[in-house]
């Protein structure tokens, strides 16, 4: 199969999109990097009628690791530790001790006026995670294409899925 050109215009745009894919958590889908089609796919774990979302037979793909909830939680703690305003940090720490800490943290950060700093922090960290994953899995973006060393890729086969 002939590989297509990447829809990503730069290495940075690919890393940013990969970072988003790594941070999306859905128990019903896996994220794949399709090297043949040059895109990121969210693939249903169960058979569905949405077959167009699946890689084509013979496509070269690699499963994209997810950022765990614990890793994301730890980033909230690190962000709080970086804030020097003693009036804000207790409010953010309290938000981490409720039943739904991620939503509570976002709400507390919004009310404290640090939500933009949080999102900048989070974007930088997620992009670093994406770069690390790329390095560990032999993935790069060169000459307008996503390339791989082949050590971690596999050829998609419907026989493997059924």
What are these regions (language model features)?
Residues 1-8:
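Short N-terminal edge-element motif at the start of the domain
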Residues 11-97:
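The feature represents the first ordered module of a protein
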Residues 120, 124-162:
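Long, highly charged low-complexity segments enriched in Glu/Asp and Lys/Arg with interspersed Ser/Thr
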């Amino acid at each position: 199969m002939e590989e297509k050109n990447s829809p990503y215009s730069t290495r940075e745009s690919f890393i940013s999109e990969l970072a988003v894919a790594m941070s999306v958590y859905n128990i019903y889908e896996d994220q794949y990097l399709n090297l043949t089609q040059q895109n990121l796919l969210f693939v249903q774990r169960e058979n569905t009628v949405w077959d167009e979302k699946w890689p084509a037979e013979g496509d070269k793909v690699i499963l994209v690791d997810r950022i765990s909830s614990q890793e994301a939680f730890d980033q909230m703690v690190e962000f709080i530790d970086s804030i020097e305003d003693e009036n804000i940090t207790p409010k953010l720490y309290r938000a981490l001790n409720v039943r739904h800490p991620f939503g509570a943290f976002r709400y507390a950060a919004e009310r404290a006026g640090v939500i933009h700093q949080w999102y900048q922090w989070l974007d930088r960290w997620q992009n670093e995670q994406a770069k690390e994953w790329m390095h560990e899995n032999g993935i790069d973006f060169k000459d307008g294409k996503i390339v791989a060393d082949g050590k971690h890729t596999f050829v998609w086969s419907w026989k493997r899925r059924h």
